Amino acid sequence: MGVKDLLSRKTGVIVGDDVLRLFQHAQENVFAIPAIMVTSSSTGSALEAARDKSPIVLQTSNGAAYFAGKGKGVSNDGQSVAGSIAIAAAHYIRSQAPAYGIPVVLHTDHCAKKLLPWLDGMLDADECYSKLHNEPLFSSHMIDLSEESVEWNIETTAKYLKRAAPMKQWLEMEIGITGGEEDGVNNESVDNNSLYTQPEDIYTIYKTLSAISPYFSIAAGFGNVHGVYRGDIALRPLLRHLHNAKYDEQLKCLQDPLGFFVFHGGSGSSHQPATSITSEFAAKGRVDLEKVAYLPGTSSLVIAPKDYLMSPYGIPVVLHTDHCKYFDPRVQIREGLKHMSARVQEAKDDFNDSNQAKKLLPW
């Protein structure tokens, strides 16, 4: 089936039923869509890697949005800075994405209890945008109440899904603990046994949320950890099958009964676990790249010509030569972006996402 039969919008930011169809297609064809964290010019490097070939998720976190806007010197009370910058990023991505010939899911990441005002503000923007364009500004949002009780997590997530549902907007929720540290939630010291979500929680989430809307996914704990693994983390994607098998009789459903799963912690995982996760359950895999992939590129333009960088007038041997080109931050940043783009390609290969758009786009 070609993408003309699958998606109503062929390129650019997709929403609603197109997001649902894309994730369904990923499940049926055993690939996961890489979700790439972007901050600024990293948006272009992610799109560059996927150009004409692969669907992609572009997402920003509260921390990244605040970082991009904190230079304004204004208070972030009520998440005003993080909210306004995330909204600005959404408009920027919407303007750029169609040029790359691929479907793009526009997403915001995490959002703990203390950051809910950020989500509230973005939903306000979604509703305003929807009145004008009959679709939300963002394709999807995430709510991460994994630090709270399971009951409050599910109850609050359901409330937000009810708000998003009329816009056919996707909501990703986290249940259980993802190790490491991300966006102000620190689970670096938790016991490994705490990194696995219980089947009964998944079942309760599915029953509760599916009664409201089909536009949701679950970021469950399968031993995954944010950041670079140290070799002592055991990913257990087969737990997904145990979740489904335990409740298959109650649901009596021939299709995947427990919805769509998201794999967090893809940045530091080796290729084999990431590929295994994809083949077992994930329709989306989150990869936080800008922290890891920028450095090799930018540092190569600092370490190698370090003598030139000591003075804009050149090294002592060539006193009258202008070496200002070595100081151009655009050159350094571009080298970092090239490395990031290559890392995005690795993630697409790991998640079996490479050339999926070409498979979907036969023209």
Curated annotation (Swiss-Prot):
Residues the record marks as active site: D109
Upregulating conditions: Only detected in the mycelia phase, but not in yeast cells.
Catalytic activity line of the entry: beta-D-fructose 1,6-bisphosphate = D-glyceraldehyde 3-phosphate + dihydroxyacetone phosphate
Cofactor binding note: Binds 2 Zn(2+) ions per subunit. One is catalytic and the other provides a structural contribution.
Cofactor or coenzyme needed: Zn(2+)
InterPro entries: Aldolase_TIM, FBA_II, Fruct_bisP_bact
EC number(s) per entry: 4.1.2.13
Cited function: Catalyzes the aldol condensation of dihydroxyacetone phosphate (DHAP or glycerone-phosphate) with glyceraldehyde 3-phosphate (G3P) to form fructose 1,6-bisphosphate (FBP) in gluconeogenesis and the reverse reaction in glycolysis.
Family membership: Belongs to the class II fructose-bisphosphate aldolase family.
Stored PANTHER family: FRUCTOSE-BISPHOSPHATE ALDOLASE, FRUCTOSE-BISPHOSPHATE ALDOLASE CLASS 2
NCBIfam families given in the database record: cbbA, FruBisAldo_II_A, PRK09197.1
Name used for this protein in its record: Fructose-bisphosphate aldolase 2
